[in-house]
Amino acid sequence: MAETNNECSIKVLCRFRPLNQAEILRGDKFIPIFQGDDSVVIGGKPYVFDRVFPPNTTQEQVYHACAMQIVKDVLAGYNGTIFAYGQTSSGKTHTMEGKLHDPQLMGIIPRIARDIFNHIYSMDENLEFHIKVSYFEIYLDKIRDLLDVTKTNLSVHEDKNRVPFVKGCTERFVSGPEEILDVIDEGKSNRHVAVTNMNEHSSRSHSIFLINIKQENMETEQKLSGKLYLVDLAGSEKVSKTGAEGAVLDEAKNINKSLSALGNVISALAEGTKSYVPYRDSKMTRILQDSLGGNCRTTMFICCSPSSYNDAETKSTLMFGQRAKTIKNTASVNLELTAEQWKKKYEKEKEKTKAQKETIAKLEAELSRWRNGENVPETERLAGEEAALGAELCEETPVNDNSSIVVRIAPEERQKYEEEIRRLYKQLDDKDDEINQQSQLIEKLKQQMLDQEELLVSTRGDNEKVQQELSHLQSENDAAKDEVKEVLQALEELAVNYDQKSQEVEEKSQQNQLLVDELSQKVATMLSLESELQRLQEVSGHQRKRIAEVLNGLMKDLSEFSVIVGNGEIKLPVEISGAIEEEFTVARLYISKIKSEVKSVVKRCRQLENLQVERHRKMEVTGRELSSCQLLISQHEAKIRSLTEYMQSVELKKRHLEESYDSLSDELAKLQAQETVHEVALKDKEPDTQDADEVKKALELQMESHREAHHRQLARLRDEINEKQKTIDELKDLNQKLQLELEKLQADYEKLKSEEHEKSTKLQELTFLYERHEQSKQDLKGLEETVARELQTLHNLRKLFVQDVTTRVKKSAEMEPEDSGGIHSQKQKISFLENNLEQLTKVHKQLVRDNADLRCELPKLEKRLRATAERVKALEGALKEAKEGAMKDKRRYQQEVDRIKEAVRYKSSGKRGHSAQIAKPVRPGHYPASSPTNPYGTRSPECISYTNSLFQNYQNLYLQATPSSTSDMYFANSCTGSGATSSGGPLASYQKANMDNGNATDIKDNRSDLPCGYEAEDQAKLFPLHQETAAS
């Protein structure tokens, strides 16, 4: 019951946001000019509101200026509404929600959630509060529950006081601000949001957060109730600016349509002359009917953009706010009378009714006297007020005369009509139930149809993509086949070249073998020469000793002869000189022979070098051509290694020859020194030995030049051998790389073949689905013909029914012609019933058509049902396995349960004195959730992890369902609060906990399937098995 009516206007507040980054980069101007706290000038025109907030206003200032008083009004029993209206990206969601868990940037809704409980905690302790919250959105003109996403099309009904409400919406009982924030987080995650050119997080629906507060005074039993609607409207959009396309464009159309309906309601209420206000044009205006011109205290936020780019939209928004400011609401306290108050009111109304009956009796007596022709004196007449009252009563009860006329109908006929009326009303009730069931079925089937259409569209898109990919893969496959053909041809050519090169290699190997034999012969010759050279050296040494001895003897003889003769010239005999020349001649012959042997060896080495270079060149060509053939390369590598070893051995032999050559050179130098000494001794023989000296010098120069050339040639050969070895290593690496690439190409080819096979199978499946779709179309045609025949039959039955009713009316008129008034009213009732029957017939036709349309979807649904059944079987198997795993982990969980037991005992000292009942009542005078006595009332990570671990272990114990475990006894005993034993194990404790927390008893709490929906702020709410609850 509502009392204490107060007329008040809608409070309109205007808020401008700052320029965003895009507007600053675009160079937009800041157009509003603020004049005081209640006016703003746009384009030279002033707009006046209750309050105007500039861009630098904080969230806290906005809340204190507008929303704080509404919290007090709602707690005092009034209804309240706060909603934000404006263009898209104007800051509506920031104003209403903000950042939920940021103390500085949180919006109106989280601040109201905290402020409500702060006021409650400071109120009288005799009051008890029950707080429920709901959260839903209006998306594409359908009401969608944000706390239960399965409810996608809720309806709007009226209660006994003709106040609109959303039927079937989820209602959650809360006992603290953190629980409200959790509900907001859950609903916000399910809300529709999209990206547009003007807003990265554009709301695509109107969201309504409803807080229903009921309070009861435990002493006086007085009850008050208040509702607070917190509405975040979607922004009006100009498609040319937002760039909406596809589904976003459809959302924009519905948003603008509903906002246009809101504007029409505001305009009609602002004019005040229209008798009809189009509340039913939109579900949003229907829900907010009481907030616009009804029993509510309403605050409207007008959110505007300060950019010159949005000049037109800003002016339109400000004009909308000015019209809304003229609307008058009649707010009253929602008070429920107590039994004593109802009794007093009943006595008062009883006395008033008795007085009215007396007045009616006097008026009837006076009226009968006037009809009988008597003249009633003025003293006996009733006073003017009483006569007016009697006239008013006569006007209010015209139906009683008709009822008296109806009574004159025969009892049998009246009973017959009453039975007919009861039957018809029963049929109406049955039809209503059937219509409700059919409408629910239609909604489900329509939703399934939409799902199937979406699936079909996605399947078609996937089919097109698959076709494109298939064509692309076919082209790639053709190209790959061509490449494979080319590779095969190249391999064939390489095989032919391989055979040719193999033959060439065999020939070269034979040639190399011949060269090796020749080289071995030359080496043997060189060894014999070395031995001969050593023998000659020995002979030469022996001769030199002999010559030295002879010369020494001669010198002694000459010295003695010179002493005897004096300074006479002494000449050696010719035989001695001839012997020396003969010795030198023999030495020169040996030296020339050695030179000729060395030249032949050098010449042969050059030939070998040329042959080696030619062979390496041919092997490099062979390596490039036969890179993909690993066997051939390995053979070449073996041969190259053998040749390299051979060259190394040749090089060693060359070094030995070089060393022997050096030793011969040293011996020659010694001989030259001795010859020099001999020349000094034999000065008189100088003209004869001059030719020999020149020959020795020429021979020495020639030997030196040959030695240097030989050293250079050997160094060059070593460098070339090293380079060839590097080339061989590089060829090995290249061969390995090419072999890996060939293996990769083969793997890719196999992968392409498998993908082609998969695409062909998918194409066959899509072809099969298309054939099934065509068959469904043919079945649909047959069903339409069947429905047409059924409609014709229904039409014939209706005609027969009308004829029957007409004949009955005619018979009743012939039997009692004097009861024309009763028959007339009966005809009206019959026509009313006929109209109802006709409407039911239309509804039935529509239902038949809908059913015919939906029957063709039955095969698909049956297929999905079979798939679902198979999935359920698989899940049951998985569940069975999980249970077996849980039984295995029982010992490990036991230790965790013991630890939690100690933690719960430690935390039990911080619980509140009064635990939550089914409806979670909130008592003033207790400490709030963040008080020192309840340190775990905050949303800290430690508390959340603690609660999660507690619930997880309890759930595992519930799944095990073993009464013998000590953990079951712990939960049964510790949750009762008295230490008494409890039967039933963890299953009974689990069910009891759900009942006491409002999850199984309250018919409006739709979270009965979520046993974990508790806050960490009150650990006792998880398992509150109190003695008083058990007693009740």
Curated annotation (Swiss-Prot):
Residue ranges of the region described as Microtubule-binding: 174-315
> Could you provide one GO biological process annotation from this protein's UniProt record?
vesicle-mediated transport
Which segments carry the region annotation Disordered? 904-939
Q: Which GO terms describe its molecular function?
A: ATP binding; microtubule binding; microtubule motor activity
Record keyword Cell cycle present: no
Reactions the enzyme catalyzes: ATP + H2O + a kinesin associated with a microtubule at position (n) = ADP + phosphate a kinesin associated with a microtubule at position (n+1, toward the plus end)
Q: Which PANTHER family match?
A: CENTROMERE PROTEIN E (PTHR47968), KINESIN FAMILY MEMBER 5A (PTHR47968:SF62)
Binding of ATP: at which residues?
G86, Q87, T88, S89, S90, G91, K92, T93
Q: Which residues carry this modification: N-acetylalanine?
A: A2
* Sequence similarity: Belongs to the TRAFAC class myosin-kinesin ATPase superfamily. Kinesin family. Kinesin subfamily.
Keywords on record? Acetylation, ATP-binding, Coiled coil, Cytoplasm, Cytoskeleton, Hydrolase, Isomerase, Microtubule, Motor protein, Nucleotide-binding, Phosphoprotein
Q: Name one GO cellular component term.
A: axon cytoplasm
Coiled-coil spans are 331-906
Q: Which organism is it from?
A: Pongo abelii
Where can this protein be found? Cytoplasm, Perinuclear region; Cytoplasm, Cytoskeleton; Perikaryon
Q: What class of enzyme is it?
A: isomerase
Function description: Microtubule-dependent motor required for slow axonal transport of neurofilament proteins (NFH, NFM and NFL). Can induce formation of neurite-like membrane protrusions in non-neuronal cells in a ZFYVE27-dependent manner. The ZFYVE27-KIF5A complex contributes to the vesicular transport of VAPA, VAPB, SURF4, RAB11A, RAB11B and RTN3 proteins in neurons. Required for anterograde axonal transportation of MAPK8IP3/JIP3 which is essential for MAPK8IP3/JIP3 function in axon elongation.
Modified sites of kind Phosphothreonine: T397
Tell me how this protein assembles. Oligomer composed of two heavy chains and two light chains. Interacts with GRIP1. Interacts with FMR1 (via C-terminus); this interaction is increased in a mGluR-dependent manner. Interacts with BORCS5. Interacts with ZFYVE27. Interacts with VAPA, VAPB, SURF4, RAB11A (GDP-bound form), RAB11B (GDP-bound form) and RTN3 in a ZFYVE27-dependent manner. Interacts with BICD2. Interacts with DTNB.
Q: Where is this region: Necessary for interaction with ZFYVE27?
A: 271-361
Name of the molecule in the record: Kinesin heavy chain isoform 5A
Supply the SUPFAM superfamilies for this chain: P-loop containing nucleoside triphosphate hydrolases (SSF52540)
